[in-house]
Amino acid sequence: AMENAGAVINKALVAQYTKYCAEAQKEVEKEPPHMRRGTIPEMVLTDAMIANARNESNVAIISIVRLAGEGRDRKLEPGDYYLSPEEHALMAGVKQHFEKVVVLLNVCGQMDMEWVDVYQPSAVLMVWIPGQEGASAAADILMGHVNPSGRLTDTIAKSWRDIPSSENFGAWADGFELYTGDEDQIPYWGGVGNHEMIPVGETVVRPLGNRRYTEYQEG
């Protein structure tokens, strides 16, 4: 998709990753069908591999993937709502060698965004689960062929705890907030709707829609 959009890609790294994916998929298929993961384990990039990639490219694109669905609920755990240790290591390693880093969030729902302040990528593109032509659409955005309007249909908080309605979900072992309902009722006394996010200020990564986040320069 990036090549079709006009980008020059690191073909050696693509070939290496394609080979890895084929081998990893064979291992996944050895598992019973009902126990198979939705994705394969990501290939580990060594510091030397990242440094070599920098010699071939001036922009790095990191894709973060999350899947969920029936029988596979989201969890407040590393590798789901939070970045995994491997993803943290990848972010840190890539930022060490690349000045320009773009993160694609190919995810089924919101996730923790506090890492944006830590690693400060050049851009973060939320593509959700975009479907068959999603890669082409993302490539057109990254190459500047279309305007990433940022007209969000949701409010993305930096942290789960910044969402007011989080007080009404689950029973927290970490002492944050115990479930406030009983066995028969869930109280929606507050925190429902995007208007509840307005007072939280810096806890919001981007506010709800109706504006563009693209900056323009004439000349």
Q: Language-model segments: what does each one mean?
A:
Residues 13, 17-119:
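Hydrophobic helix-and-loop "lid/oligomerization" segment in the mid-to-C-terminal part
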Residues 1-38, 106, 110-219:
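Secreted, periplasmic, or luminal enzymes acting at the cell surface/secretory milieu
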